[in-house]
Amino acid sequence: MTDTWWLNPCKAIDAQAYEQALARQQQLTKPAGSLGQLEALAVQLAGLQGQVKPSVDSLWIAIFAGDHGVVAEGVSAFPQEVTGQMLQNFVTGGAAISVLARQLGAQLEVVDLGTVTPSLDLPGVRHLNIGAGTANFVNGPAMTEAQGQLALQAGRDSAWRALANGAQLFIGGEMGIGNTTAASALACALLDCPVSDLTGPGTGLNAQGVSHKVAVIERALALHAGQRGNALQTLFNLGGFEIAALVGAYLGCAQEGIVVLVDGFICTVAALVATRVNPACREWLVFGHRGAEPGHRHVLQRLDAQPLLELGLRLGEGSGAALAVPLLRLACALHGQMATFAEAAVADRPA
């Protein structure tokens, strides 16, 4: 690997803005700590953005799509063609994330990294055609090093486009039939956890289907066990193009100074990979929700993450993170617009 851009320094937190925001928070007309996690969130955003009164009005949502060779093992309840069909749904406005993006006034981009229908040419979709999906990782690496680096760069490019458009907040979403299998395999390899702890129904497998999925992942982990110590190589061995793009996007955002709102299980596994590659990126990651997929809780705990919502979600697409955006915006509004005790002429301590 010649250009190891993913190891470049992440932007430093503005300690002065953080301290000033913390001091302001303690002067607002409310008992200290009474707004709970929203207070810490506003102060965290202040330090990241370098502004005492932060804002997340400008939102960029990038959906990364790719197919998975491991689907040949029968690990998904849905056929692979759905990945390509959903690309159309994203850009025509019918998907959940499309609706949420409109409601939030977000800019939505859709990036096709490589599906089993590479002849797709959809207006509004960036088709990169890295490959016709990944290879079956039970038989060998999911992708070559060259493909993996292209996928990482695709995510970084999206972060750059977000920056150029003045984005204050970045959400990455994913679409790829079979990608919970890839995410579970990746998480197991990086966390050295039992496969059954991190593997769930995905798009709707029954108990027998989940057991089969566990067995498939165990075969893959045995095949690639020798390279578990290398997070990037493990990503290339067991991940998906869209997961690698998420890793690249998260690292790119941290290096450029854009706050990331992380979505569900698959995105959180991508965040785990990113923190293993470049630990300093962790400060730039805010976690939107804890989803229904059983492995999500384990990965969040390992990242010491406190997700904002828990609604039993398991859709993906960036939808759970998008649902948390109003909380971030309201946390900023409360922090920026509430009066201080001095401004409101309110006594700042009990009688």
Swiss-Prot record:
It comes from Pseudomonas fluorescens (strain SBW25). Catalyzes the synthesis of alpha-ribazole-5'-phosphate from nicotinate mononucleotide (NAMN) and 5,6-dimethylbenzimidazole (DMB). The keyword Iron does not apply. Keywords: Cobalamin biosynthesis, Glycosyltransferase, Transferase. It catalyses: 5,6-dimethylbenzimidazole + nicotinate beta-D-ribonucleotide = alpha-ribazole 5'-phosphate + nicotinate + H(+). Belongs to the CobT family. Pathway: Nucleoside biosynthesis; alpha-ribazole biosynthesis; alpha-ribazole from 5,6-dimethylbenzimidazole: step 1/2. The active site is at E317. This is Nicotinate-nucleotide--dimethylbenzimidazole phosphoribosyltransferase. HAMAP family: CobT. The lineage of its organism: Bacteria, Pseudomonadati, Pseudomonadota, Gammaproteobacteria, Pseudomonadales. Pfam families: DBI_PRT (PF02277). The gene is cobT. One of its GO terms (molecular function) is nicotinate-nucleotide-dimethylbenzimidazole phosphoribosyltransferase activity. Gene3D superfamilies: 1.10.1610.10, 3.40.50.10210. NCBIfam families: cobT_DBIPRT (TIGR03160), PRK00105.1 (NF000996). GO terms for biological process: cobalamin biosynthetic process. Its EC number is 2.4.2.21.
